[in-house]
Amino acid sequence: MMITQEFETTKTLKLSRMIGNTPMIKISDKIYAKAEMFNPTGSIKDRPASYILDNAVLTGQLKEGDTIIEATSGNMGISFAWLAAERGYKCKIVMPSNMSDERKQMLRLYGAELIEVGEGDFDGAINLRDKMAEENGWFNCNQFNNPLNIKSHEEGTAEEIIDFFEGKYLEYVVTGTGTGGTLMGCKKKLDKKYPLIKMIAVEPAESPVMSGGEPGLHGIQGTGDGSKFLVDMNKVHKVMTVTTEDAKDRVIRLAKETGIFVGISAGSNILAAERWVEENKPNGYVVTFLCDRGERYLSCL
């Protein structure tokens, strides 16, 4: 039996239409976590990646058959590679070599060309991305310095948080910072609803750049890399640090105790939120993020 065009247009969707509207999971009486691993590729980065590419199409910067390029620790690259496969673009990803094998495998699975630079060398990855984009006329997604990254969370993630906490006192947002898009986008929107809300940034103890320290190698992939571009430190109430081993331990305990298996940055977020609640006894609620799924870190745990 043939499927009619009417059925195709009313009953079927491209997978990218399923980005966002992720559920909220209760971690404790005070802490809720937005389950971003339910986005199509399993991470929060589907939100800004789609927003950036949609805008590029609308403004005439991108068309089918073009090439996009990005520097990434993995998740944003995976989102761009997936969207490129869905929409008919070629995709080049520049990535430090010490990222997980699972992330690299996913990028290649979606058809992206992976270009590796030295361990932890995000500045090198960004510089190479910019050079290749300019020399070849490719679309530079530019996640680390792109205001659309912030806008995607302002219009999407933060709106969903407001809907969930309607009628309740939301006091803190605790989140790791990679580009800083989630932190700044949520701050911009949530300020209007909760004028007293405070943002707690979380970074790896081994790379405490926001705390005034030196960058270093760490295992909390997706955090501690590039936040200097988008984060306005005047809007950050506190910076907390979590070690890689503590974050991994929290991931494993969460899986064994609740059946929720998330990535290492999510373990860091939960642990930081728990420590904040224990030390500060907030009156209101705390929201954090389960940024991605745990399967892409099996080789790292």
Residue ranges: model-predicted function:
Residues M1-L301:
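PLP-dependent amino-acid enzyme catalytic core
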